[in-house]
């Protein structure tokens, strides 16, 4: 799945996408951010904007994940923190800010199931209502499909 995600990021870059926004969760968000930071080493026009739900997001993560997380933040272009402390809606607010600032949304979830959690489900609904194009990489089939309403037209 990581290889397919990197391939999709590189395809978007070839289509002149230079700015990537990531919510920096310990799963796909961290993988994507690390991949973008690696690409930035040879592509000075590429930018990574990290939208953190709150400052202590990684406090309870395993030490190896915290290490990767802080390295990723150190290497990114810009960090924006939604809240100083954890709030029930901070993750959703981070996703919404990303959606508002994006022309295209790239998601990773099992297209045969609902999104990973309530914040992710609400964020996907928000992207669709915002009429943003949404590309999804299915982590099991590795298929990329367009899931927004405009895909039907």
Residue ranges with predicted function:
Residues 1-151:
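Acidic/glycine-enriched connector segments
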């Amino acid at each position: 799945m990581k290889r397919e995600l990197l391939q999709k990021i590189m395809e978007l870059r070839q289509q002149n996408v230079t700015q990537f926004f990531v919510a920096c969760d310990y799963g796909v968000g961290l993988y994507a951010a690390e991949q973008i930071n690696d690409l930035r080493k040879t592509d000075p026009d590429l930018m990574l904007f990290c939208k953190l739900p709150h400052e202590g997001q990684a406090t309870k993560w395993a030490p190896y994940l915290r290490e990767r997380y802080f390295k990723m933040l150190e290497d990114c272009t810009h960090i924006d923190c939604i809240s100083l402390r954890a709030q029930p809606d901070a993750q959703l607010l981070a996703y919404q800010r990303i959606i508002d600032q994006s022309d295209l949304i790239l998601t990773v979830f099992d297209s045969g199931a609902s999104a990973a959690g309530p914040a992710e489900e609400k964020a996907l609904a928000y992207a669709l209502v915002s009429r943003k194009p949404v590309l999804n990489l299915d982590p099991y089939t590795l298929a990329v499909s367009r899931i927004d309403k405009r895909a039907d037209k």
